[in-house]
A protein has these predicted regions:
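Flexible loop/hinge segments that line or gate small-molecule binding clefts
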Residues: 69-71, 108-136, 140, 265
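His/Asp/Glu-enriched short active-site or ligand-binding loop at hydrolase and phosphoryl-transfer sites
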Residues: 63, 67, 190-212, 266
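Bacterial lipoprotein signal-peptidase II cleavage site
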Residues: 18-31
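A short, structured surface patch at a secondary-structure boundary
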Residues: 40, 44-93, 97-102
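Structured C-terminal subdomain patch of bacterial secreted/periplasmic proteins
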Residues: 39-40, 131-132, 136-139, 148, ...
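Basic- and aromatic-lined ligand-binding clefts that recognize polyanionic substrates
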Residues: 34, 38-55, 146-199
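Proline-aspartate-enriched helix->loop->beta-strand connector
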Residues: 87-100, 117, 216-230
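Bacterial N-terminal signal peptides
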Residues: 10-18
Length: 293
């Protein structure tokens, strides 16, 4: 319980610092027009905002982020960071629905419920779950065609890349998710863990149902993974320095086969987020290079 509590606190910190155009065709269906006329949707994470853009759905509010949001939403009111949206701001937008992610549901649902805001938490913890969420949004907002295009594109990529790695030796993998001063271990139930699984890799952490766990280096050493992936979020430059220091000063790391064989890789934050996103295709390509050099 203590380990899970620590992991929960660290995950909250990670999410706090890390998650921090086209016109519709003229032949719009009556369902689409009706939907857009009454829906006032607020997206509270960058990943969700990008998905709504791909579906060509308008929003009335977007998250506050250092990342560049889709042009479609330029100038829209910002509602704060994904971990702690400004509830007064959200309420002032008279939203009909607020979109967040299941990774934040435990922390945010009571807050939204407490102020009477209707929130929907999208499951972006894996490629398949993200595809299902996109399909559901397409049906809900009359954007079935756009949703099908996105889902099909992802399906084709997964099928193609799995054929490329079929028959190759499956590497064992350790995934570390870090913020300044600390880090967690990502399980196969995390988004990055799912990407590794899609490519045939075996996460050394098995039998867990949560996305992230507190680190136990002694246990990790016994598993001795072929590859170590280090994901840095929020302040990637600072986190990479933290990881470098940890690996140099903590004697245990030099005994890992992945370290001895120079198979420790830093993941680009733009591609490897804490939740699924539309950069998944590029992320799979990059991950394949690391897992099967």
């Amino acid at each position: 319980m203590r380990v899970k509590k620590i992991a929960s606190v660290l995950m909250a910190i990670i999410l706090l610092v890390s998650i921090a155009g086209c016109s519709s065709p003229k032949k719009e269906t009556a369902k689409q027009v009706k939907s857009e006329s009454k829906e006032r949707i607020v997206a509270t994470t960058v990943a969700v905002t990008e998905i709504m853009d791909a579906l060509e759905v308008d929003l009335v509010g977007v998250p506050t982020s250092s990342k560049t949001l889709p042009k479609r939403y330029k100038g829209l009111p910002e509602v704060g960071n994904p971990m702690s949206p400004d509830m007064e701001k959200v309420k002032s937008l008279k939203s009909s629905e607020v979109l967040s992610v299941t990774t934040l549901e435990y922390e945010l649902k009571p807050v939204f419920d407490g102020v009477g805001i209707k929130a929907n938490f999208l499951d972006l913890t894996s490629l398949k779950n993200m595809q299902n969420s996109i399909s559901d949004l397409g049906k809900k907002y009359g954007r079935e065609k756009q949703a099908e295009e996105v889902v099909t594109k992802l399906d084709k990529k997964v099928t193609s890349i799995q054929k490329e790695v079929k028959g190759k030796k499956e590497p064992t993998v350790l995934i570390l998710l870090g913020v300044p001063g600390s880090y967690l271990v990502a399980t196969e139930h995390s988004y990055i863990g799912d990407l590794v699984k899609q490519l045939g890799g075996k996460n050394i952490v098995q039998g867990e149902q949560v996305e992230y766990l507190a680190s136990n280096t002694e246990y990790l050493k016994k598993a001795d993974p072929d590859i170590i992936l280090r994901a840095a979020h929020g302040m990637p430059d600072e986190v990479v320095k933290m990881f470098d220091k940890e690996f140099k000063t903590n004697d245990i790391w030099k005994h890992f086969a992945a370290v001895k064989n120079n198979r420790v890789y830093d993941l680009e934050e733009r591609l490897f987020g804490t939740t699924g996103n539309l950069a998944a295709i590029e992320a799979l390509d990059e991950l394949k290079k690391m897992m099967y050099p």
